[in-house]
Amino acid sequence: AYQQRHVGTQETQLTMLQRLQLSAAAHYKIIDRCRDRQIRFLSTPFDLGSLEFLTNDLRVDMLKIGSGDLTNAPLLLAAASSGLPIILSTGMAALAEIEQALGVLAFGYAPPSGDRPCHASFKRAFASAAGNAALKAKVTLLHCTTEYPAPEAEANLRAMETMRQTFSLAVGLSDHTPGIAVADRK
């Protein structure tokens, strides 16, 4: 339905995504071009295979996790276990969901001795000094709306301050509003 309204095509979302998917060769070409121009390459994995490709094959130095995967504990755990810094998009998440995601990341970065991955272990990792230190060193929260394009009235820039105060982490904005007006707000 989205494609029909906004793109004007009858193809399914799966067909569209398969058509737009970059090959491994295209990734290598893009990352080489970025390195030649001293541009930091960044990519978002949406599954464990893509995460492995980015970390093991392309050897990226940072990951971005999309809002839709904020509750994908296996992906979050594997991403943090890579040791790479992570930009975590928060989309429509409640603070409790962000805290749960941060618990998974804290566990992946600094697993408490002998703990198996589970909700209780994630909470302990989030509350631990080692987990907090890892989060502060490695994680940036990204405030964003999930509407494309987003009306200025929906930008809710105060959410960034709330996240910064709640989690004491670096916070940024993924701006989906048209133009640059939101960037000029104080």
Language-model features: locations:
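Catalytic cores and adjacent flexible loops of soluble metabolic enzymes
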Residues: 1-186
